[in-house]
Regions:
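Active-site core segments that coordinate phosphate-bearing ligands/cofactors
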Residues: 20, 27-90, 101-112, 116-117, ...
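A short, polar/charged loop-to-alpha-helix boundary motif
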Residues: 10, 19-24
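Carbohydrate-associated surface elements
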Residues: 16
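N-terminal glycine/serine-rich phosphate-binding loop of ATP-dependent small-molecule kinases
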Residues: 1-12, 37, 126-127, 144-155
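Active-site neighborhoods of enzyme catalytic cores
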Residues: 2, 135-139
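A conserved beta-strand/loop element that lines the FAD pocket in flavoprotein oxidoreductases
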Residues: 121-125
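Glycine-rich phosphate-binding loop of ATP-grasp-fold ATP-dependent ligases
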Residues: 8-9, 95-102
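Gly/charged, well-structured mid-domain segments that form the phosphate/adenylate-handling core
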Residues: 130-134
Length: 257
C-alpha cells in the first residue's frame, strides 16, 4: 500500500503454484505463443503476472485501493528499493521486469495487451531502468550511525542474471550454470533475441550503457531443495552431505534409471 507502506499480502515465492488455474485458463485459450513472442517466456505460475492477478482476485480491498492509486507492485528488488528510499523510488531494472510475463522484451515497455489478460492496471507497475543506474539513496539508513548520511543504490538485477554477470559471461555464447534450490543455465546472446524450440526461455540479461543484452535460460526448479526434502521430510539422513553416501551406494536408484 503506497500510503501505509504495508504489504497487502504475504510475499509469494517463485516456486508457488497457487495461481496455476489462472495460467491454465490462458493456455487453454491458445495464448502461449503470443506470450512467448512478446516476453520470451511461457505461461507459468513461476512468473509474476498470475500471482498479481491471484492477489487481486482473493484479497479484499486490493482492487478498490488500486482504483484509488494506492497499490504498488514489485518483485523483491522493487520492494527493497522502495523501503530503503523511504517510499520515494518505485522502480525495477530490465532483467527483473522481463520475468513478470507482462513486459515486452522488444519494445522494452509494459505490454498493454498482456496486462488486459490478467486485468492488471499499469498504474501499479514500477518504472523500468537500466541495471546499472543511481536509483536513489538509502535514506532509511540515515538514522544509523554509519559515518555518512546516505548510501547510493546503484544497481538492480535478477539473481541468475547477476550470476551471469558475476561469472564475466560478457561475450556471445558465454554460459554459466548455478546449482542451488534449483539449477539454472544462462547463455549470453548479446543483442539477439533468440527463441528456443527445446524448452529454453528467452530473457533480458541486463541493461547497461544505453543498450539491452539478452540470454537463453534453461531452468530446473528442483535440485538442492530435493536434498532438503530428503533430509527434513523423508528423514533419510541428518546432514545434507550424507546424501553422497547414498548416491554412491550400490544401485542407489533401485533400477529406476
Amino acid at each position: 500500500n503506497k500510503k501505509t507502506g504495508r504489504p497487502v499480502y504475504n510475499a509469494i515465492v517463485w516456486q508457488s503454484r497457487q495461481s496455476q488455474e489462472i495460467c491454465d485458463t490462458l493456455i487453454e485459450r491458445g495464448l502461449n505463443d503470443l506470450f512467448k513472442k512478446k516476453t520470451g517466456l511461457i505461461i507459468n505460475p513461476y512468473f509474476s503476472a498470475s500471482k498479481i492477478k491471484w492477489i487481486f482476485d482473493h484479497v479484499k480491498t486490493v482492487q478498490d485501493d488500486a482504483n484509488k492509486g494506492d497499490i504498488l507492485f514489485g518483485t523483491i528488488d522493487t520492494y527493497l528499493l522502495w523501503k530503503l528510499t523511504n517510499g520515494k523510488v518505485h522502480a525495477t531494472d530490465y532483467s527483473n521486469a522481463s520475468r513478470t510475463l507482462i513486459y515486452n522484451i522488444h519494445t522494452l515497455e509494459w505490454d498493454d495487451e498482456l496486462l488486459k489478460f490478467f486485468n492488471i492496471p499499469k498504474s501499479i507497475l514500477p518504472k523500468v531502468l537500466p541495471s546499472s543506474h543511481i536509483y536513489g539513496f538509502a535514506t532509511a539508513l540515515s538514522s544509523i550511525d554509519m559515518g555518512f548520511n546516505t548510501i547510493p543504490i546503484a544497481s538492480l538485477i535478477g539473481d541468475q542474471q547477476s550470476a551471469l554477470f558475476g561469472q564475466c559471461c560478457f561475450d556471445e555464447g558465454c554460459t554459466k550454470s548455478t546449482y542451488g534450490t534449483g539449477c539454472f543455465i544462462l547463455m549470453n546472446t548479446k543483442d539477439r533475441i533468440i527463441y528456443s524450440n527445446k524448452g529454453l526461455l528467452t530473457t533480458i540479461a541486463w541493461g547497461l550503457d544505453g543498450k539491452v543484452e539478452y540470454a537463453l535460460e534453461g531452468s530446473v526448479f528442483v535440485s538442492g531443495s530435493a536434498i532438503q526434502w530428503l533430509r527434513d521430510g523423508m528423514e533419510m539422513f541428518k546432514n545434507s552431505s550424507d546424501c553422497e553416501k547414498a548416491i554412491r551406494g550400490e544401485n542407489p536408484s533401485g533400477g529406476i534409471y
